[in-house]
Structures are given as structure tokens and as C-alpha cells.
Amino acid sequence: MSELLSVALFLASVLIYAWKAGRNTWWFAATLTVLGLFVILNITLYASDYFTGDGINDAVLYTLTNSLTGAGVGKYILPGIGIALALVAVFGALGWVLRRRRHHPHHVGYSLLALLLALGSVDASPAFRQITELVKSQMRDGDPDFAVYYKEPAKTIPNPKLNLVYIYGESLERTYFDNDAFPNLTPELGALKNEGLDFSHTMQLPGTDYTIAGMVASQCGIPLFAPFEGNASASVSSFFPQNICLGDILKNSGYQNYFVQGANLRFAGKDVFLKSHGFDHLYGAEELKTVVADPSYRNDWGFYDDTVLDEAWKKFEALSRSGQRFSLFTLTVDTHHPDGFISRTCNRKRYDYDGKPNQSFSAVSCSQENIAEFINKIKASPWFKDTVIVVSSDHLAMNNTAWKYLNKQDRNNLFFILRGDKPQQETLAVKRNTMDNGATVLDILGGDNFIGLGRSSLSGQSLSEVFLNVKEKVLAMKPDIIRLWNFPKEIKDFTVDRDKNMIAFSGSHFRLPLLLRVSDKRVEPLPESEYSAPLRFQLADFAPRDNFVWIDRCYKMAQLWAPALALSTDWCVSQGQLGGQQTVQHVDKAQWQGKTAFKDTMIDMERYKGNVDTLKIVDNDIRYKADSFIFNVAGAPEEVKQFSGISRPESWGRWSNAQLGDEVKIEYKAPLPKKFDLVITAKAFGDNANRPIPVRVGNEEQTLVLGHDVSTITLHFNNPTDANTLVIAPPAPVSTNEGNILGHSPRKLGIGMVEIKVVNVEG
């Protein structure tokens, strides 16, 4: 209703000003500004909805204040460009319409009415309401009800008798199981759901709407609110250290806790969270690649669900035979937005909707078949009678190719339980949320019926029942939840552990690299993750007088303040203010001691602007002084004009990537020498090993042969045509996720380059 009202007020404002207000520069500017704000708010809402499927939420607010670059956004570039172009077009059209009758005499009354209507349209818009509530949540000091409803459970279960299998289905919300809306989409898992305790109204709350947040909510009974973007939590060394979560209780009760997934455990700090809360046995992409039957059978995120669930079954079987008490948690990935993935063992690899194939629905149908097969193996085993099986979505689906169809339904998370000891078939329509999942499981296992803000849906009352405005209530508790992290409020002395890649200060530990914004009584950690901007881009958003401590590889800060370290991949510490003085110190000891020293100096805005501009230079445009192309640092030597077909820097060097260009091309500013040696230190990937690799300069071509290990080879070139471009053409680029960033499309790797040097032998 508010959406229609806001649009009506917007149109009324435009019409009244365009046809009645007449000519006045001030009123025109004011009205256009407010109407433009309405347009920006609604485009922001649309864009946020595209990324999150949940409007302008907490994650979007973080992104608006911390620029997002890098991983996982490739498939959203075109929509982003489209939105930007639409914004320019709408502003231009709006200005043209408002000035249609600019030659008419000015009328103050109509101008004022148009401006008030424009202000009303902004105030009534859902986007403004969502942003206002989020900003309020940042300003609050907490909610008195938090202390009333936050409850810490007993640390043990008396006399536990049941093992636990807990399956997180990636984005596998309950809406998919509506057979009227999506006929025969989930027949196998849907049949199992109908055999157990099925909780039909599990809502999603703020801070529980992505994978690690959903896991924290379901095990600790709290949303994932932190002083940094949630997926960046991989940089912390402990995760809600004060909380008692389900894994802690299970471990204290004699359970061996296992977690199995196909993606890398480091992503979003799942390894840190699980290790902090009772899990000693973790298996992700790195751990599984040495045990799975086919290590190359992977999707963009890791191993397919059929592989992961097969390994989970092996773990279940071995643990059951051992007779020890255990919990086995597993997380699928094939239903990850925006498209999903189809494993090769599914019987149904295609699901049509509206008369055409839909990739997301197809992935759901396939993944649920894999999950059902895993559950049926457990049910058919002699150990099911001692087992509780839980199936839940980690969060509602984000904007995938099925999302617009999901939004036409009443959306809820999936949560159902199959008890081998006490079969029970019932659909429970009690209002609840994902924070109640862990407490419900704990209740069944014989423990308390509460964890944090979560309550058992079998014997307690959910906050979703207590508060009609439960979403606003949870946002009001955000400061209370952030305080549970027990983050330090100051930094004076700190220690960098060079070998463990850690920094410690005020009793807290963080993984490197790390950026800290330091103010009175607050230290804000800004980690680097797959979904956050590189730290130098985050630093570029700092105000001129903001104090910072930046711990990163030396070459990343050298271009600004330490040119001598431009090729160093060691750790360095920089601190200061972007508009004032900065220092760079080389970490030259295994345990390096540092102190903060922020000088109260005069702010130089020219210096500030220069620092910001330099920080924002993209990697490929960075240039350094060197007599060779060093591939494990960003950029290229000053002599290089441009290059293509080369992937990002890694610790050892860079791969060629045919997705970025069929050949490696390095164009120099000046012609290469008439006669020179080309010294190449490199290795080959896959079928490119031990095969001739053409290397061209002008009309002359040599061949390079590389093995799987790094070697150095010298080629002799004549360059009579004064060519300035070096071309290397790997013969058989291999599509692979080897070394890839999670969620990125596979790279096509050919050769791995460590260093290329041109040695002039002319004369």
C-alpha cells in the first residue's frame, strides 16, 4: 500500500510542478533533488532486491558504506550497468518534464505543494522506511528486552542417547515443496518431510539471511551481527567466544562433532565458527580432494552434492560402527544462486516452468534427490533407531532464476525432523524462526529448550510469537549482540605473527591482512574476504582525519609510501591518516612488536586526494620499477604499456587465463631490442605440460616446453621489425576451478608465470 501511495505522490508532484509551478531556479532545483532522491531510493531498492532477494537489508547497508569489488559479482555486472544507465536517463527525463512550462510565471503555492508531495513520496516509499530502520539499528545502544529473552543453556545434556545428523540445504526453502505451485519439484525429499515433524512457518529474520549467518542462528540462537560484513568473518580467530552454542553442548556431552561440505571451509569463517564451538572434525574442499573418487568433479563453489553426501554417508557409517556418540553436520551447495548446479548422478536433470527449462528449479530437484538418497540410506541402516535427522535450509533463496516465482508464494525456511527412536508425523504451524532450530534439536536430544534468543518449537515460545514486530525487535538488539563479540575498544601495542599470519592486540587475534579504523573508544576491524573490497579500496573510503592501521603485503602499500618495497611480498604495517602523515614499517621478525602513533597534524586535502586516487588504481594499471615482470605482485614494470590474458596474482605468480584472452600478450611502451634473450620462469597446467608452447615477437616464433614444476628457460630472439609485443599461446587451456575464488566461473589455465625478463644482447 505504501508503495502505491509513494508512486501516486511522486506523479502528483511531477504533474503539479510541470504544469502549474512555472519558472524558478531554486524551486526547480529543490523539487528535482527530492524527486531524484525518490528515484535513487527506488533504484537502490530494486538493485538490492536483485542481489539479496530481501530488499535493503543489513548486508546492503554494509556494501553502501564499504565498496564491493572482486569475487562473486561477475554475473551482476550487466544489471549494474543497466541500473546506472537507467538512472541517468530517468534524471534527464525528469528534468525535461519539470521544465516543460518554464516560461510561465512562477507560482509559490503550486511550487510548495509540489515540493511537499515530493517529500511525502520519499517518506512513504518502502526504500526510505527500510533504510531509516537500518540506520536506526546502527544508532541504538541496545534493547532492554535482550537481557530478558537472551538465555544461556546448560553446557551438557544429561545422559544423551541419540546421534544427530543435521543437513543444511543451501537456499532450499520450504516454498519449493509446495506441490501446487511447483508440481513434482521435490517428490523424494517432500515425501520424507511428510513422514516427520514438519515446521511450516519458519521465518527469516535480519542477520540470518546468508549461509554463515543461518548457521550461527540455528546453532547459537542469535543473528550474525558484527562490526564488519558477515562474510568477512574469516579474518577473526574466534567467533562469538562468549556464547554457548549447540556444538559446545554436544562436545561437552561426549559427542564427536563432524562437519562436511563441498566448498572451502575458510569462506566466511565457517572453520573459525565451527572450531570455536565444539567441532573438531571439519571437511571442506581442501580436505576432501585427497579422498573423493574424482577430485576434478567440481562446480564453481566446490564438490557437487552427490560427492559430499556420499562422503557424509561414509562418515555416518564409520561413526555408527564405532559406537561413539556423534553429530554429523553437512551443507549442500548445488542450489546456490544465481543459477545452481546439476550433479551427474541425478535422475532428473531438468525441470520446466512456464513451458521452458529453469536452471534453479532443476538444481533444486536434483539436490533434493541427492539429500533424499542420503537420508534413505540412514533410514535403511540398523543405526537409524539411535539417530535424529534434521533437514533445514540455511536461509531463503536469494535472487536466482526461480526467485520471481518464489515471491508469489508465502515464503518460509525449511525445517523438519525425522526421529529414528520415536517416529512422529505431524505438521506444526507454530510461528517460529531459524534461531529456534538449535533449541528444538537440543530439546529432542534431552537438553534445555532454549539457546540464546532461540526457543524449542516443541515446548517453548518463539520470539516470532512474542513480538508482532519481531524483525524490528531483532534489529533493536543489534548493539547487544555485537557486544557479545567482546571486541577491543582500543589499540596501543600490537604483535604481528609473521609465520601464523596473525595480529594480536588488547586480547584479540585476527587473521591477516587487516585494516583497522581507530577512534576514541572504538576499534573497527575491516577484514578482507571474497565478497569485500581489497583493503586499499576500503581505506580509500576513509575520511581525511580517520586514524588507520593497515597490515598487508608490502607491495600493496609501497606505491604510496614505500617505493623501495614495491616488489616485497612480506608483511608491512602502515598507520596514520590519509590527509596527514603515514608510516610504513617492514615486519622483519617472526614476532614483530608495534605501537600505534597517530600524530595530530594539519590535514592536507591535496595529499588526501592523491592518496585516495592512488589507492583506487586497479591492479593492472599499477606500475613498478624493475628489470623484469614479477608475477606474484600486482601490476607490471614501468616499461609495460598493457597486458592481457593473465589472471590475478597469487603467492607464487600468475596463471594465464584464456577466459581473459586466448593468448598472453605483453605490450611494451618501446620496441623490444633488435636482439635479446627472453628468460622465462614458469610452469604448465594440465595438458599444456611437455608440449610446444608458441612464443612470438613480431614475425619470429620460438617454442617453449614446460613441465608441471617451475623451471627457467631462455629463448633467443631477433627483432628486425622493432616489434613491441610479446605473445605466448598455451596450446590447450584447461577449464578448471583449481585455485579459484569461490563462486567464480572456472578459469582456463595454460601456463603459470613466475617471472619474464628481457635481456638485451644487441651488439
Swiss-Prot record:
Q: Where are the transmembrane segments?
A: 1-21, 26-46, 77-97, 108-128
Q: What is its main location?
A: membrane
Q: Which CDD domains match?
A: LTA_synthase
For this UniProt entry, which residues form the secretion signal?
A: none
Q: Name the Gene3D superfamilies for this protein.
A: Alkaline Phosphatase, subunit A
* Compartments (UniProt record): Cell inner membrane
Catalytic reactions of this protein: a phosphatidylglycerol + a membrane-derived-oligosaccharide D-glucose = a 1,2-diacyl-sn-glycerol + a membrane-derived-oligosaccharide 6-(glycerophospho)-D-glucose
Q: Name one GO biological process term.
A: glucan biosynthetic process
Q: How does it sit in the membrane?
A: Multi-pass membrane protein
Q: State the protein's name.
A: Phosphoglycerol transferase I
Please spell out the taxonomic lineage of the organism that makes this protein: Bacteria, Pseudomonadati, Pseudomonadota, Gammaproteobacteria, Enterobacterales
Gene name, per UniProt, is: mdoB
